[in-house]
Amino acid sequence: MEFRIAADELKKALHRAQGIVERKATMPILSNVLVTASKSGVTVAAFDLDIGIVSEHLAEVSKPGAITVSAKTLFDIVSFLPEAQVTVKKLPNNFAELTSGAAHYKLVGMAPEEFPRLPKDDAAHAVKVSGPTLLEMIKKTQFAISNDETRYILNGVFFEPREKGLVRMVATDGHRLALVERELSGDFKLKSGVIIPRKGLFELKRLLDEAPDADCQLGFAENSAIFKKPGLSMVMRLIDGQFPEYQRVIPKEGEKQLLVRRDKLFDALKRISLLSADKSNAVKLSLSENLLRITANNPDLGEAKDDLEVAYRGGTLTVGFNARYLIDVLGVLETDEVSVELGDEHSPGVLRPPGDRSFTAVVMPMRV
């Protein structure tokens, strides 16, 4: 095998693979990429047995073939090549040779036949979707995905087609919940919702971030999801299980509703939480007519408070929250103001854009 390719093009392919390959894999070959050269160009594949990606790139191929070498090592080398072009050649005993200008590398490889086969996506029914819309939905839910591996059902986002072309995405870690509903026209042919794993979702976000406006397709088979855009395809295994009945934890309507500038609340929470307890990030919200006071107390550091003007008429209330959870929600909203609904000190808080129920965030209270 031998081909010549633009270094930036090869770097792009290898960068896509970095989040998928296993750095400390029990199977060493899962730390590799499979580079295949044919008459139509070069493909670079990465697969960790759960998520696989294949990207296609133009190249001058003088001899077809395949190699598999360390993804990280190859990426690091290509990132610092002295010339705009690089020649890749397969040597005996699965070694790979890279040449760019006066720079020359000889890398240890493995037999390409040992690289695991990626699942075929023939059974997946792919639907053309809006890249910007899908990217927005991921950004507005990913922060609430659980990192607790013992609660594997919550280690992903729930993708649920609704009526009239609407799709709902929901994530929760048991302490907070994020829900967003948008129009993604097309029939995904799903009998019920599916759970997209956290790692797969983050890789999907990275691919969408490359070119949000590019045409893309999303589809599902029995236990896998497929994402495609020009020159690239990604397949991932879905989480097998039943997502919790999330509707039950969303309060119908809070007794106390206030309107506050999003940026003011965001900045105040960041300032005051500097003196909150390290692990809990606890802050206290005290609500009275047209006033919201935010306080934090740390026996080792001291205390802090800040007052914000809000649109509110009603009784007083004091309730505690994890400041980090509130900050995460405010950070994904674009509106100038945010609506906050509260019940009592034991009830969850609900945050939404004013007059818009297509996004809902629920944050559980805490003792402070």
Model features per residue range: what roles?
Residues M1-V368:
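Structural preference for solvent-exposed beta-strand-turn elements
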